[in-house]
Regions:
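Active-site neighborhoods and metal-handling regions in enzymes and metal-associated proteins
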Residues: 1-354
Length: 354
């Protein structure tokens, strides 16, 4: 079933049309990414509106949509209201998760159809991935693995975090990335105790841990990985913390399969870290799912009591962060299957000392 056909199955109940305003939902339905635009989906027809910057690409690549331009004379509201009239739409399901209050009130006031919150049904199709989506995500992760293998040859004492971040971004594009899944995190020394620290002018030194959290995207689909490496040498404490994080990750991956609640997977990793005496230093969730967005749902974390289905792609990223000293995080991307999970990250997980 094509993605657009999946959206059409939602039109048998509370709504007779879908208003797609998020880039991700438009990408999913049209199976092609256009940065700006709005789409309407009905059983009588589907239209995609965008401006002159993207119209040629949209006309060439979008599947299943009539493509129309918006300009100074004819804007989105006029295009939408024409479609509403042409297709006899009375109720439009909209993506409340992606609209600001200002945008919602604008649509609610101007459109000639009732707006119904409909984010969850629209979003639900993206939770589990089709085989072709998994193939794109494998390609994205392979690109990220190649970038890691290259960038670690460039890490040297004396370079700054920002310089390393620039090298990392270059390596992702050089190795085939069509974009970045997110802005990379590159931190060193005591800054590695900041789970989402920001690269700065700090100079990398011998004896530092360096943590890199990064991911290339490929044709819109994300990858995500984190590796912590040591420069020159690692102390016994650094090695012990690293080994603890790795054990937590491997134990949780082994416990992951379809039907297991997200909180149980999170709890498996958390118990390993707590038993080693570092429980208070693992503050974030074990992982998140990903796809067209870097953070999706459902996720393997403590707040998710629902069983995870096969076909969900999720990160596995426990960490320990000792304030003012150092931190360690190891992250892979896994695909949940009926009898386990497939780790699609190919980079080594043993402690690398450069």
């Amino acid at each position: 079933m094509k993605n657009l056909d999946k959206y059409l199955t939602l039109l048998d109940g509370d709504v007779d049309g879908l208003l797609l305003t998020s880039r991700y939902s438009r990408h999913y339905g049209a199976e092609f990414d256009i940065a700006e635009g709005v789409a309407i989906v009905t059983k009588k027809g589907c239209r995609y509106f965008t401006d002159s910057r993207y119209i040629e690409s949209a006309e060439k690549n979008l599947k299943g949509f009539e493509v129309l331009d918006v300009n100074r004379e004819i804007g989105y509201i006029q295009r939408l209201n024409t479609a509403i009239a042409d297709f006899g739409v009375t109720t439009l399901g909209y993506e409340e998760h992606y609209l600001t209050a200002e945008e919602y009130f604008h649509y609610a006031e101007k459109l000639n159809a009732k707006l119904v919150p409909f984010h969850k049904p629209i979003y639900a199709f993206r939770a589990t991935k089709e085989d072709w989506e998994l193939e794109l995500m494998r390609k994205a992760q392979a690109i990220t693995d190649r970038a890691f293998a290259e960038v670690i040859t460039r890490i040297k004492p004396g370079m700054t975090e920002l310089e390393l971040q620039a090298e990392l971004i270059y390596c992702m594009y050089k190795n085939g990335g069509t974009g970045l899944a997110f802005d990379p995190i590159v931190v060193s020394g005591p800054n590695t105790s900041l789970p989402h620290g920001v690269a700065g002018e700090r100079v990398i030194q011998k004896g530092d841990f360096v943590t890199m959290d990064f991911g290339a995207s490929y044709m819109g689909y994300c990858s995500d990985m984190t590796r912590t490496v040591a420069v020159g040498y690692a102390t016994d404490e650094m090695k012990h913390v690293y080994d603890t994080v790795l054990k937590a990750q491997l134990t949780a991956i082994a416990a992951t399969k379809a039907g297991v609640p997200g909180k149980d997977i999170d709890g498996t990793a958390r118990k390993v870290i707590a038993d080693a005496g570092y429980g208070e230093y693992f503050g974030h969730g074990y992982g998140h799912s990903l796809g067209l967005e870097i953070h999706e749902n459902p996720s393997p974390n403590a707040s998710n009591t629902e069983p995870l289905p096969a076909g969900v792609v999720c990160s596995a990223e426990p960490g320990i962060y000792l304030p003012g000293k150092f931190g360690v995080r190891i992250e892979d991307v896994t695909i949940i299957t009926e009898d386990g999970c497939e780790d699609i990250t190919g980079s080594p997980k043993n402690l690398i000392i450069l």
